[in-house]
Amino acid sequence: MQTLTHGGDWAGYRAEFGRDPLDFSANVSPLGLPGGVAKAITASLATADRYPDPLCRALREKLAAAEGVPAEWLLCGNGAADLIFRLALAEKPRTALVTAPTFAEYATALGTVDCRVERHFLREENDFAVTDAILDAVHPGIDLVFLCQPNNPTGQLARPALVEALLRRCEAVGAVLAVDECFLDFLPEGQSLSAKRLLSTSRKLIILKAFTK
């Protein structure tokens, strides 16, 4: 059985040590639950006896309006990790590329479909930034590339021009580029840095976002 690797397992900590932890294992908002979310949860309690819409139609329409993209481009899941595993299962890549260091869930998900994971190592002399060197790592044998934007755990952000160049390189070799933007909205200029401007130009681009951030 696969062991839990994602952070936030406060229940397991409590069971083992008998007290609640100060949990820094998952990068969630320190500001707590937004008031609007609490009100929406309270308002929906009357219909809690029903199964939710499996296609998340209303949610997708709201997200589409907020993000400025068609609703049919959106797929909702139980967190970004759920969608990372779904992507690996849907694509079943033979070989994938990730940076190192980066979010460990990519390699874990790829391992469930026996995918060979190649790592593009980020260098200390470059302050662990993603540079143009990553383009050479995307060879014709690569089926899927994960790019964390900004990267977890380094916090480094790849230049938008480099992200576009990486997408074009992926297209050239037939690979899918998955850009994880779960932390991008923490940046004041996050929306302007998003790769979503490229969605209308390519069928090889997937963008991940998450509510927990």
Model-found features: residue ranges?
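N-terminal "arm"/small-domain region of PLP-dependent enzymes with the aminotransferase-like
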Residues: M1-R50, G141
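Glycine/small-residue-rich loop that forms an oxyanion/phosphate-binding "nest" at active or ligand-binding sites
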Residues: G79-L89, P93, V179-F183, L187-P188
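Short hydrophobic alpha-helical segments of the AMP-binding
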Residues: L63, L110, C170
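PLP-dependent aminotransferase-like
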Residues: L89-L147
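Short glycine-rich anion-binding loops that position phosphate/pyrophosphate groups of nucleotides
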Residues: N27-P30, A80-A81, F103, Q149-P153, ...
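Short loop-beta-helix segment that forms the pyridoxal 5′-phosphate
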Residues: P52, A64-R86
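Active-site pre-lysine segment of PLP-dependent enzymes
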Residues: F128-G141, P153-L177, E181-T212
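Conserved beta-strand elements of the Class I
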Residues: L22, L75, T95-L97
